[in-house]
């Protein structure tokens, strides 16, 4: 027993050699003796022991016929400074456990975290089949199949087909911490050298190791983040087949490093390698993510293809930020007012008034004979979501002088106004109508603006239905043509089954009260059951016809006169008194009258503000000044 403890203590304090160990064993010391759960061999083999003697280890093992071989902690041994590869070979030949996991990693991964691992040791261990990643996981890919119906593909024009989605394991998408990863992330520690030989061997052993990702990033990403960078190491870890998204993440991380680490200098060789022949989509997304003009300019300066084409692609397919445009201009790109605005609108979601204003103010004009180059197509802005309504309205106001056709229709015959009605955008509908949108356009499917309003107001919940009713009043108060009215009446009559709610009668009354202003006899003939309601409406119509200014009644002022002529009436006390009335049925007309008064006042205020002494405008007759501003703002 005494010799057992002496042997253990000598091993524990590393104060032993082969001769003394042999003497103690011959004197009866048992190498299998345990103290606090440790045998002499386990106490001796530890990373704290900087001088593990092979002959001592072999003696402790061979004296008991290697029964204690797994007391040799191979994890601890691989962390020591004096690893003997021949001893490792002997231990492996005698059956030491080499496939175990300790603290979540295997022995190869553990060895990779040491200060100066040896290629030969890696080769010995990896040739024994120890995995280069002890906890590998795989991504997934989506398998999409179109659903067949009745033996044919189920397909509508411009409609999404039905698809079946299945998720399958993607064995090419490997995720986990590899030996290479452990080696790289530990190189930033003091005294931990980075060996190109080690990296080349590990990659040659398993080429796919470069493609493994941890937290969605490759080992190269962590190398550029953690270590002092050398080109030869970068080249060994770099692969041009990395995804464009990952390459831009690597570049972003590399460029940002100058703000995290003092004296870090950007190596243009690395920037060029990461940018070379890359999909411009990823480059532009990187520019957006950086939000730092210094970094963006660094990328653009190294971009070797056309910066002008890059700007065009940017405004066409990406969320646009003004600072990125400015950086491109600084690098030689030319911003064109209408060309780039039209491209900007083509990407769904590009609805930033500040960007539009910047391009309009700073963009160059294309000087040629094609007037279309100096016009803006606003159709791609629609349909829009209600949450972007104010942004789109601001954009329309900015683009108003340059809009090519406010009544442009799509291939279904739907106008911009029609799309805004469907999305119950009250402010957009009102602005479009005030600025010349045609309320009488009929779609290929026979819908009018009135029709869609009535149908949707009847179908939606009360809160949304109220918006459609308000839009309906706005449209009808502008008085549609009799052709539009007849098309609406015919459609609603042919599709009565659509109206199953209790709202349809009130909706029809809204239509009828304006229809009679266009064609009284036709309306009465189509809706004989509403004669009593029509009679009540006529009383308010008669009131509007009785109130006159120099022989011109209020309905004539509102519906028969052009904008400049209306300006002569709206400030008349008779008109302003009438605009204060409250009608039961025709308050929308009163609302429109008050809008005219408000617009007229704005014009008067602007005329007064700009008509200062000695400018050209002030020398014009007042009536001419009113005429100019009336055309511009009424």
Curated annotation (Swiss-Prot):
Pfam families: Ank_4. Induction: Expressed in the early phase of the viral replicative cycle. InterPro entries: Ank_repeat_dom-contain_49 (IPR051637), Ankyrin_rpt (IPR002110), Ankyrin_rpt-contain_sf (IPR036770), Pumilio_RNA-bd_rpt (IPR001313). Keywords: ANK repeat, Early protein, Host-virus interaction, Inhibition of host innate immune response by virus, Repeat, Viral immunoevasion. The keyword Repeat applies. It comes from the Viruses. GO terms for biological process: symbiont-mediated suppression of host innate immune response. ANK repeats lie at residues 36-69, 70-100, 103-134, 175-211, 307-337, 412-441. One of its GO terms (molecular function) is RNA binding. Plays a role in the inhibition of host immune repsonse by counteracting the action of interferons on early events in the viral replication cycle. Belongs to the orthopoxvirus OPG025 family. Interacts with components of host SCF complex CUL1 and SKP1 and components of the cullin deneddylation/COP9 signalosome complex subunits COPS7A and COPS7B. This is Ankyrin repeat protein OPG025. It comes from Vaccinia virus (strain Copenhagen) (VACV).
């Amino acid at each position: 027993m005494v010799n057992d403890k002496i042997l253990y203590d000598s091993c524990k304090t590393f104060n032993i050699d082969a001769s003394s160990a042999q003497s103690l064993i011959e004197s009866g010391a048992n190498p299998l003796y345990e103290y606090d759960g440790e045998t002499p061999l386990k106490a001796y083999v530890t990373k704290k022991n900087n001088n593990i003697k092979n002959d001592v280890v072999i003696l402790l093992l061979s004296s008991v016929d290697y029964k204690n071989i797994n007391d040799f902690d191979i994890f601890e041994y691989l962390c020591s400074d004096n690893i003997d590869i021949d001893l490792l070979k002997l231990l492996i030949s005698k059956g030491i456990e080499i496939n175990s996991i300790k603290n979540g990693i295997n022995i190869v991964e553990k060895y990779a975290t040491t200060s100066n691992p040896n290629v030969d040791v890696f080769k010995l261990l990896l040739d024994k089949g120890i995995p280069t990643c002890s906890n590998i996981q795989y991504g997934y890919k989506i398998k999409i199949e179109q659903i067949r119906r009745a033996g044919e593909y189920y397909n509508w024009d411009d409609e999404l087909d039905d698809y079946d989605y299945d998720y399958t394991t993607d064995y090419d998408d490997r995720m986990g911490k590899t030996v290479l990863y452990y080696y790289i992330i530990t190189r930033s520690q003091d005294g931990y050298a980075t060996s190109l030989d080690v990296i080349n061997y590990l990659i040659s052993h398993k080429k796919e190791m470069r493609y493994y990702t941890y937290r969605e990033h490759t080992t190269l990403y962590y190398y550029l983040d953690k270590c002092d960078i050398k080109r030869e190491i970068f080249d060994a870890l770099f692969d041009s087949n990395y995804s464009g998204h990952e390459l831009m993440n690597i570049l972003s991380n590399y460029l940002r490093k100058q703000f995290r680490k003092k004296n870090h200098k950007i190596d243009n060789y690395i920037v060029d390698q990461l940018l070379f022949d890359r999909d411009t989509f990823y480059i532009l997304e990187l520019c957006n993510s950086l939000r730092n003009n210094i970094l963006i300019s660094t990328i653009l300066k190294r971009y070797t293809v056309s910066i002008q084409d890059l700007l065009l692609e940017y405004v066409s397919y990406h969320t646009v930020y003004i600072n990125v445009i400015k950086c491109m201009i600084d690098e030689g790109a030319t911003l064109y007012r209408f060309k780039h605005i039209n491209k900007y609108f083509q990407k769904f979601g590009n609805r930033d008034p500040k960007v539009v204003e910047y391009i309009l103010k700073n963009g160059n004009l294309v000087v040629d004979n094609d007037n279309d180059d100096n016009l803006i197509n606003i159709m791609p802005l629609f349909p829009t979501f209600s949450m972007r309504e104010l942004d789109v309205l601001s954009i329309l106001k900015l683009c108003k002088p340059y809009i090519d056709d406010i009544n442009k229709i799509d291939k279904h015959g739907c106008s911009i106004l029609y799309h805004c009605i469907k999305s119950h955008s009250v402010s957009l509908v009102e602005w479009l109508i005030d600025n010349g949108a045609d309320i009488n356009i009929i779609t290929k499917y026979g819908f009018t603006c009135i029709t869609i309003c009535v149908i949707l107001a009847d179908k939606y919940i009360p809160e949304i239905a109220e918006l459609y009713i308000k839009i309906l009043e706005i449209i009808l108060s502008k008085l549609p043509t009799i052709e539009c009215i007849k098309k609406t009446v015919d459609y609603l009559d042919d599709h009565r089954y659509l109206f199953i709610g209790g709202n349809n009668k009130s909706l029809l009354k809204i239509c009828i009260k304006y229809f009679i202003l266009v064609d009284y006899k036709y309306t009465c003939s189509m809706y004989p059951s509403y004669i009593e309601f029509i009679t009540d409406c006529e009383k308010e119509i008669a009131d509007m016809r009785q109130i006159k200014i120099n022989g011109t009644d209020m309905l004539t002022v509102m519906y028969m006169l052009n904008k400049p002529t209306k300006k002569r009436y709206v400030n008349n006390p008779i008109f302003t008194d009438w605009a204060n009335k409250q009608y039961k049925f025709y308050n929308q007309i009163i609302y429109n009258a008050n809008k005219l008064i408000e617009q007229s006042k704005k014009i008067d205020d602007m005329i007064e503000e700009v008509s200062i002494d000695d400018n050209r405008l002030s020398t014009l007759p007042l009536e001419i000044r009113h005429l100019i501003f009336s055309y511009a703002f009424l």
